[in-house]
């Protein structure tokens, strides 16, 4: 019995040491985004600017919908929408080909684009606000969307739409 105990005791001591070492508090690691402080600094500045611009966009969009005669609802993504014409009760299905008529203006401003084009539902080709709105629509519905830039064409824009544009669609 003693021999058995002596053979197991070193394992017990070793196990105890491993557990104690494993329980020591690990030092916090500094998170580096790109391993390059200059790039990290530029990325953080861009992020802070985008947060500031998103807040301003939210204020502008809210002010616009509050002064419009139509009652809008706000989506949890941050855009506002109002169904202005109700079509039939056939919901739009994933993969379905749709004919869309999109009129896009700057909020309270100039018409940027007035176009009809075919779109496959769920293809991801359209901005977030439009894709999400299509999911809420039935065939024949018309909807007005007030979209802050981060749910519209974002920081890049398009050939017609400037970056950071808040849009009325």
Please place each PLM-identified region on the residue numbering:
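Sec-dependent bacterial lipoprotein signal peptides
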Residues: 1-23
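Cross-family detector of peptidyl-prolyl cis-trans isomerase
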Residues: 6-7, 23-169
